[in-house]
Protein backbone atom coordinates (compact mmCIF):
# COMPACT_ATOMS: atom_id res chain seq x y z
CA UNK A 1 0.00 0.00 0.00
CA UNK A 2 2.78 2.45 0.94
CA UNK A 3 4.82 1.63 -2.17
CA UNK A 4 1.70 2.07 -4.34
CA UNK A 5 1.10 5.53 -2.85
CA UNK A 6 4.75 6.45 -3.42
CA UNK A 7 4.45 5.40 -7.04
CA UNK A 8 1.20 7.37 -7.51
CA UNK A 9 2.83 10.62 -6.34
CA UNK A 10 5.87 9.85 -8.55
CA UNK A 11 8.16 9.63 -5.54
CA UNK A 12 7.89 13.34 -4.72
CA UNK A 13 8.65 13.98 -1.07
CA UNK A 14 6.03 16.61 -0.11
CA UNK A 15 3.04 14.75 -1.67
CA UNK A 16 4.44 11.60 -0.05
CA UNK A 17 4.46 13.35 3.35
CA UNK A 18 0.79 14.28 2.92
CA UNK A 19 -0.17 10.75 1.81
CA UNK A 20 1.68 9.04 4.66
CA UNK A 21 0.18 11.43 7.25
CA UNK A 22 -3.32 10.69 5.95
CA UNK A 23 -2.61 6.95 5.77
CA UNK A 24 -1.22 6.94 9.32
CA UNK A 25 -4.27 8.73 10.73
CA UNK A 26 -6.75 6.57 8.81
CA UNK A 27 -5.17 3.20 9.63
CA UNK A 28 -4.79 4.15 13.31
CA UNK A 29 -8.57 4.50 13.50
CA UNK A 30 -8.83 0.70 13.13
CA UNK A 31 -5.37 -0.73 13.86
CA UNK A 32 -3.18 -0.29 16.93
CA UNK A 33 -1.06 2.84 16.45
CA UNK A 34 2.12 0.91 17.34
CA UNK A 35 1.65 -1.40 14.35
CA UNK A 36 0.83 1.52 12.05
CA UNK A 37 3.93 3.50 13.05
CA UNK A 38 6.20 0.45 12.89
CA UNK A 39 5.43 -0.46 9.29
CA UNK A 40 5.14 3.15 8.06
CA UNK A 41 8.50 4.04 9.62
CA UNK A 42 10.08 0.96 8.05
CA UNK A 43 8.78 1.84 4.58
CA UNK A 44 9.77 5.50 5.05
CA UNK A 45 13.35 4.47 5.91
CA UNK A 46 13.48 2.26 2.82
CA UNK A 47 12.20 5.07 0.58
CA UNK A 48 14.58 7.57 2.22
CA UNK A 49 17.54 5.37 1.37
CA UNK A 50 16.46 5.17 -2.27
CA UNK A 51 15.26 8.77 -2.68
CA UNK A 52 18.08 10.31 -0.60
CA UNK A 53 16.07 12.37 1.91
CA UNK A 54 16.07 12.68 5.70
CA UNK A 55 13.20 10.44 6.92
CA UNK A 56 12.92 12.06 10.37
CA UNK A 57 10.37 14.76 9.36
CA UNK A 58 8.15 12.12 7.78
CA UNK A 59 8.48 9.72 10.73
CA UNK A 60 7.63 12.48 13.23
CA UNK A 61 4.55 13.36 11.18
CA UNK A 62 3.49 9.70 10.99
CA UNK A 63 3.83 9.25 14.75
CA UNK A 64 1.78 12.35 15.50
CA UNK A 65 -0.96 11.45 13.01
CA UNK A 66 -1.17 7.86 14.27
CA UNK A 67 -1.91 9.10 17.79
CA UNK A 68 -4.29 11.70 16.37
CA UNK A 69 -6.20 9.19 14.23
CA UNK A 70 -6.38 6.74 17.11
CA UNK A 71 -8.26 9.34 19.16
CA UNK A 72 -11.11 9.36 16.63
CA UNK A 73 -12.52 5.89 17.33
CA UNK A 74 -13.19 3.51 20.17
CA UNK A 75 -10.67 0.96 18.88
CA UNK A 76 -7.97 3.41 17.81
CA UNK A 77 -6.09 3.89 21.10
CA UNK A 78 -6.11 1.73 24.27
CA UNK A 79 -7.47 4.57 26.50
CA UNK A 80 -10.49 4.84 24.20
CA UNK A 81 -11.14 1.11 24.49
CA UNK A 82 -11.01 1.42 28.28
CA UNK A 83 -13.29 4.49 28.30
CA UNK A 84 -15.74 2.99 25.80
CA UNK A 85 -16.11 -0.40 27.46
CA UNK A 86 -16.25 1.05 31.00
CA UNK A 87 -18.88 3.69 30.19
CA UNK A 88 -20.84 1.83 27.51
CA UNK A 89 -20.01 3.99 24.49
CA UNK A 90 -20.12 2.64 20.94
CA UNK A 91 -17.84 3.05 17.93
CA UNK A 92 -20.14 5.72 16.50
CA UNK A 93 -20.30 7.60 19.82
CA UNK A 94 -16.56 8.20 19.49
CA UNK A 95 -16.78 9.05 15.78
CA UNK A 96 -19.52 11.59 16.52
CA UNK A 97 -17.74 13.22 19.46
CA UNK A 98 -13.95 12.80 19.34
CA UNK A 99 -13.90 12.06 15.59
CA UNK A 100 -15.24 15.52 14.75
CA UNK A 101 -12.48 17.40 16.57
CA UNK A 102 -9.82 14.98 15.30
CA UNK A 103 -10.83 15.81 11.72
CA UNK A 104 -10.37 19.53 12.42
CA UNK A 105 -7.05 18.92 14.16
CA UNK A 106 -5.78 16.76 11.30
CA UNK A 107 -6.26 19.56 8.76
CA UNK A 108 -4.39 22.02 11.01
CA UNK A 109 -1.58 19.54 11.73
CA UNK A 110 -1.24 18.74 8.03
CA UNK A 111 -0.71 22.44 7.33
CA UNK A 112 1.64 22.78 10.34
CA UNK A 113 3.96 19.93 9.34
CA UNK A 114 3.95 21.02 5.70
CA UNK A 115 5.09 24.49 6.77
CA UNK A 116 7.74 22.95 9.04
CA UNK A 117 9.19 20.43 6.61
CA UNK A 118 8.30 21.49 3.05
CA UNK A 119 11.52 23.39 2.30
CA UNK A 120 13.70 20.67 3.80
CA UNK A 121 12.01 17.90 1.79
CA UNK A 122 11.89 19.91 -1.45
CA UNK A 123 15.59 20.75 -1.10
CA UNK A 124 16.44 17.06 -0.69
CA UNK A 125 14.31 16.22 -3.73
CA UNK A 126 16.09 18.83 -5.89
CA UNK A 127 19.52 17.80 -4.61
CA UNK A 128 18.83 14.18 -5.56
CA UNK A 129 17.48 15.12 -8.96
CA UNK A 130 18.04 11.77 -10.69
CA UNK A 131 15.50 9.05 -11.49
CA UNK A 132 14.23 7.00 -8.58
CA UNK A 133 14.06 3.22 -8.75
CA UNK A 134 11.99 1.64 -5.98
CA UNK A 135 10.80 -1.94 -5.60
CA UNK A 136 7.51 -2.73 -7.31
CA UNK A 137 4.55 -2.75 -4.85
CA UNK A 138 3.71 -6.34 -5.81
CA UNK A 139 7.10 -7.58 -4.56
CA UNK A 140 6.10 -6.69 -0.98
CA UNK A 141 3.52 -9.52 -1.02
CA UNK A 142 5.34 -12.81 -0.51
CA UNK A 143 2.24 -14.96 0.10
CA UNK A 144 -0.74 -13.83 -1.96
CA UNK A 145 -3.22 -16.28 -0.37
CA UNK A 146 -2.26 -15.20 3.14
CA UNK A 147 -2.45 -11.54 2.10
CA UNK A 148 -5.97 -11.83 0.64
CA UNK A 149 -7.25 -13.92 3.55
CA UNK A 150 -5.74 -11.54 6.13
CA UNK A 151 -7.25 -8.55 4.31
CA UNK A 152 -10.67 -10.25 4.45
CA UNK A 153 -10.28 -10.87 8.22
CA UNK A 154 -9.24 -7.24 8.74
CA UNK A 155 -12.28 -6.02 6.78
CA UNK A 156 -14.52 -8.27 8.89
CA UNK A 157 -12.95 -6.84 12.06
CA UNK A 158 -13.71 -3.28 10.92
CA UNK A 159 -17.33 -4.21 10.08
CA UNK A 160 -17.83 -5.91 13.47
CA UNK A 161 -16.36 -2.93 15.32
CA UNK A 162 -18.50 -0.44 13.42
CA UNK A 163 -21.69 -2.45 14.01
CA UNK A 164 -21.01 -3.72 17.55
CA UNK A 165 -23.74 -1.50 19.02
CA UNK A 166 -26.29 -3.17 16.72
CA UNK A 167 -24.95 -6.74 17.05
CA UNK A 168 -24.42 -6.28 20.83
CA UNK A 169 -21.01 -7.92 20.53
CA UNK A 170 -18.50 -6.49 22.99
CA UNK A 171 -15.11 -5.26 21.82
CA UNK A 172 -13.51 -8.10 23.79
CA UNK A 173 -15.69 -10.67 22.02
CA UNK A 174 -14.82 -9.18 18.62
CA UNK A 175 -11.13 -9.33 19.51
CA UNK A 176 -11.37 -13.03 20.36
CA UNK A 177 -13.31 -13.81 17.15
CA UNK A 178 -10.78 -11.97 14.97
CA UNK A 179 -7.82 -13.58 16.76
CA UNK A 180 -9.23 -17.10 16.24
CA UNK A 181 -10.00 -16.40 12.57
CA UNK A 182 -6.50 -14.99 12.06
CA UNK A 183 -4.90 -18.13 13.50
CA UNK A 184 -7.12 -20.36 11.34
CA UNK A 185 -6.27 -18.37 8.19
CA UNK A 186 -2.58 -18.39 9.08
CA UNK A 187 -2.65 -22.14 9.62
CA UNK A 188 -4.38 -22.80 6.29
CA UNK A 189 -2.19 -20.46 4.24
CA UNK A 190 1.20 -20.53 5.96
CA UNK A 191 1.32 -23.76 7.94
CA UNK A 192 1.32 -24.87 11.55
CA UNK A 193 4.73 -23.34 12.33
CA UNK A 194 3.46 -19.84 11.60
CA UNK A 195 0.55 -20.30 14.04
CA UNK A 196 2.91 -21.46 16.79
CA UNK A 197 5.22 -18.50 16.16
CA UNK A 198 2.29 -16.06 16.45
CA UNK A 199 1.07 -17.65 19.71
CA UNK A 200 4.61 -17.47 21.12
CA UNK A 201 4.77 -13.82 20.09
CA UNK A 202 1.73 -12.82 22.18
CA UNK A 203 2.79 -10.34 24.87
CA UNK A 204 1.57 -12.29 27.91
CA UNK A 205 3.44 -9.98 30.30
CA UNK A 206 1.33 -7.05 29.11
CA UNK A 207 -1.87 -9.06 29.53
CA UNK A 208 -0.89 -9.87 33.11
CA UNK A 209 -0.03 -6.19 33.66
CA UNK A 210 -3.54 -5.14 32.58
CA UNK A 211 -5.09 -7.77 34.85
CA UNK A 212 -3.16 -6.41 37.82
CA UNK A 213 -3.87 -2.81 36.79
CA UNK A 214 -7.64 -3.19 36.83
CA UNK A 215 -7.52 -5.08 40.13
CA UNK A 216 -5.51 -2.19 41.62
CA UNK A 217 -7.92 0.43 40.25
CA UNK A 218 -10.88 -1.48 41.69
CA UNK A 219 -9.09 -1.54 45.04
CA UNK A 220 -8.51 2.22 44.94
CA UNK A 221 -12.17 2.76 44.09
CA UNK A 222 -13.46 0.52 46.90
CA UNK A 223 -11.20 2.10 49.52
CA UNK A 224 -12.35 5.61 48.58
CA UNK A 225 -9.00 6.92 47.33
CA UNK A 226 -10.43 7.85 43.92
CA UNK A 227 -13.36 9.62 45.57
CA UNK A 228 -10.85 11.80 47.42
CA UNK A 229 -9.28 12.75 44.07
CA UNK A 230 -12.73 13.49 42.60
CA UNK A 231 -13.63 15.67 45.60
CA UNK A 232 -10.32 17.53 45.29
CA UNK A 233 -10.95 18.33 41.59
CA UNK A 234 -14.48 19.50 42.40
CA UNK A 235 -13.21 21.70 45.25
CA UNK A 236 -10.44 23.27 43.13
CA UNK A 237 -12.89 23.99 40.31
CA UNK A 238 -15.38 25.65 42.64
CA UNK A 239 -18.09 23.42 41.17
CA UNK A 240 -17.74 25.03 37.72
CA UNK A 241 -18.38 22.51 34.93
CA UNK A 242 -16.14 24.45 32.54
CA UNK A 243 -13.20 24.45 34.96
CA UNK A 244 -13.67 20.74 35.70
CA UNK A 245 -13.54 19.91 31.98
CA UNK A 246 -10.40 22.03 31.50
CA UNK A 247 -8.70 20.38 34.50
CA UNK A 248 -9.45 16.86 33.24
CA UNK A 249 -8.41 17.68 29.66
CA UNK A 250 -5.13 19.41 30.45
CA UNK A 251 -4.09 17.29 33.45
CA UNK A 252 -4.67 14.21 31.28
CA UNK A 253 -2.58 15.73 28.49
CA UNK A 254 0.35 16.79 30.67
CA UNK A 255 0.37 13.50 32.58
CA UNK A 256 0.19 11.44 29.38
CA UNK A 257 3.22 13.27 27.99
CA UNK A 258 5.39 11.60 30.65
CA UNK A 259 3.37 8.66 32.01
CA UNK A 260 1.74 5.77 30.15
CA UNK A 261 -1.80 6.92 29.32
CA UNK A 262 -3.36 3.46 29.75
CA UNK A 263 -3.15 3.18 33.58
CA UNK A 264 -4.00 6.88 33.86
CA UNK A 265 -7.20 6.44 31.82
CA UNK A 266 -8.17 3.36 33.82
CA UNK A 267 -7.63 5.23 37.09
CA UNK A 268 -9.61 8.29 35.97
CA UNK A 269 -12.78 6.40 34.93
CA UNK A 270 -14.11 6.06 38.52
CA UNK A 271 -12.98 9.65 39.20
CA UNK A 272 -15.08 11.16 36.39
CA UNK A 273 -17.99 8.91 37.43
CA UNK A 274 -17.81 10.35 40.95
CA UNK A 275 -17.52 13.94 39.68
CA UNK A 276 -20.49 13.51 37.32
CA UNK A 277 -22.62 12.07 40.14
CA UNK A 278 -21.61 14.74 42.67
CA UNK A 279 -22.05 17.73 40.34
CA UNK A 280 -24.97 16.43 38.27
CA UNK A 281 -22.89 16.73 35.10
CA UNK A 282 -23.24 14.76 31.88
CA UNK A 283 -20.48 12.17 32.13
CA UNK A 284 -20.12 12.29 28.34
CA UNK A 285 -18.27 15.61 28.26
CA UNK A 286 -15.90 14.37 30.98
CA UNK A 287 -15.31 11.16 29.03
CA UNK A 288 -14.48 13.05 25.82
CA UNK A 289 -12.17 15.40 27.73
CA UNK A 290 -10.37 12.40 29.25
CA UNK A 291 -10.14 10.67 25.88
CA UNK A 292 -8.73 13.69 24.04
CA UNK A 293 -6.33 14.56 26.84
CA UNK A 294 -4.83 11.08 27.20
CA UNK A 295 -4.67 10.38 23.45
CA UNK A 296 -3.35 13.72 22.22
CA UNK A 297 -1.17 14.77 25.16
CA UNK A 298 1.10 11.77 24.64
CA UNK A 299 2.31 13.29 21.36
CA UNK A 300 4.37 15.94 23.15
CA UNK A 301 7.38 13.79 24.10
CA UNK A 302 9.21 10.73 22.70
CA UNK A 303 8.02 8.66 25.68
CA UNK A 304 4.42 9.94 25.80
CA UNK A 305 2.94 7.00 23.89
CA UNK A 306 4.10 3.54 22.85
CA UNK A 307 3.88 4.56 19.17
CA UNK A 308 6.37 7.37 19.85
CA UNK A 309 8.89 4.96 21.36
CA UNK A 310 8.47 2.48 18.50
CA UNK A 311 8.78 5.16 15.81
CA UNK A 312 11.87 6.83 17.27
CA UNK A 313 13.49 3.42 17.90
CA UNK A 314 12.87 2.34 14.30
CA UNK A 315 14.38 5.61 13.08
CA UNK A 316 17.46 5.15 15.28
CA UNK A 317 17.96 1.58 14.04
CA UNK A 318 17.79 2.91 10.48
CA UNK A 319 20.62 5.32 11.21
CA UNK A 320 18.54 8.42 11.97
CA UNK A 321 18.34 8.91 15.76
CA UNK A 322 15.72 11.38 17.00
CA UNK A 323 16.73 13.20 20.18
CA UNK A 324 14.40 14.85 22.67
CA UNK A 325 15.34 18.28 21.36
CA UNK A 326 14.42 17.62 17.74
CA UNK A 327 11.29 15.68 18.68
CA UNK A 328 9.94 18.30 21.08
CA UNK A 329 10.87 21.19 18.76
CA UNK A 330 8.16 20.09 16.33
CA UNK A 331 5.75 17.98 18.39
CA UNK A 332 5.27 20.19 21.47
CA UNK A 333 3.88 23.11 19.39
CA UNK A 334 1.76 20.65 17.40
CA UNK A 335 0.40 19.18 20.66
CA UNK A 336 -0.43 22.65 21.97
CA UNK A 337 -2.32 23.36 18.74
CA UNK A 338 -4.51 20.24 18.99
CA UNK A 339 -5.07 20.76 22.72
CA UNK A 340 -6.17 24.36 22.17
CA UNK A 341 -8.55 23.22 19.43
CA UNK A 342 -9.88 20.44 21.70
CA UNK A 343 -10.49 22.93 24.52
CA UNK A 344 -12.39 25.27 22.22
CA UNK A 345 -14.35 22.34 20.77
CA UNK A 346 -15.46 21.06 24.18
CA UNK A 347 -16.54 24.56 25.25
CA UNK A 348 -18.46 25.35 22.07
CA UNK A 349 -20.19 21.99 21.80
CA UNK A 350 -20.91 20.91 25.36
CA UNK A 351 -20.63 23.87 27.76
Residue ranges with predicted function:
Residues 1-2, 35-46, 59, 73-87, ...:
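Re-entrant/interfacial helical elements at transmembrane boundaries that shape
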Residues 1-54, 209-279:
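Membrane-embedded alpha-helical segments and adjacent helix-loop junctions characteristic
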Residues 1-8, 45-50, 184-196, 316-318:
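C-terminal ends of transmembrane helices
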Residues 12, 16, 25, 29, ...:
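Transmembrane alpha-helical segments of multi-pass membrane transport proteins and ion-pumping complexes
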Residues 13-25, 52-71, 103, 241-255, ...:
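Alpha-helical transmembrane segments of multi-pass membrane proteins
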Residues 14-22, 36, 59-60, 95-99, ...:
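Hydrophobic alpha-helical transmembrane segments
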Residues 46-141, 282, 309-345:
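Membrane-core helix-loop-helix motifs of multi-pass transport proteins
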Residues 99-231, 322, 330-351:
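Hydrophobic transmembrane alpha-helices of multi-pass small-molecule transporters
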Amino acid sequence: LCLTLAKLVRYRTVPLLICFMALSAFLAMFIDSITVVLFLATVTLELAQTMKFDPVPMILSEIFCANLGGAATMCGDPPNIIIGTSLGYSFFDFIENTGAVVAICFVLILIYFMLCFRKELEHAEKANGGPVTCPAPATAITNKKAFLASAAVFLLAVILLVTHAQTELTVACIGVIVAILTLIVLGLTSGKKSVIEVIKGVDYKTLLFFTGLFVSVAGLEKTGVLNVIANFITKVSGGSAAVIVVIILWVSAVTSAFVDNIPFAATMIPVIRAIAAAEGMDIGVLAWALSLGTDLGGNATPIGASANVVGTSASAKGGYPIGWGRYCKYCVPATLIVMAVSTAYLFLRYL
